[in-house]
Amino acid sequence: MLRNISLKMDYTKTREIDDYLKHVLKPQRYIHSLGVVEMAGDLASIYGSDVKKARFAGLVHDIAKCFSCETMNRLIRTYGIDLKYYNRPELAHSKVGAAMLKKDFGIDDPEILMAVSSHTAGRYGMSMLEEIVYVA
C-alpha cells in the first residue's frame, strides 16, 4: 500500500500537471505514477540525489502514456522527435512526454526532461536521476 504521498514540491507547475494526469491517465496508470513518485524519492534519498526532483520526475514520467498510436505519431511530427519512434508508442511516449513537459508545461530542467525521455529504454551514460526513474 502506498504511503501518504505529498506532492508539495518546489516546482510551480506540479499541481497543474498532477491535475492533468488525474484527468488523462487511466486510474491504474496514475496509481503507478504515484508509486514511482514514492520509489524514486526513496532511491534518491538512499543514493544522495535530489529527492524533490526525483519525485517530480517520477510523477511526470508517463505523462504521454495515454495517447493512441495515431495521436503519438502526430505529436512526434509536431515536436520534431526522431521518426524512428513513429508507430512505436510504447517507446515514443517517453520522448513525447519530455517534449510535452518542455513545450506545453514550461518545464526546462534538463535533468528532469532527460529522466522522462530515457525512462523507457535507458541510454548510455545516464545520470543518477535518470537511473533512479528508470529503476523506479
Predicted regions, residues:
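Generic N-terminal amphipathic, Lys/Arg-enriched alpha-helix
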Residues: 2-5, 9-26
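Divalent metal-dependent catalytic cores for phosphoryl transfer on phosphate-bearing substrates
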Residues: 16-24, 41-136
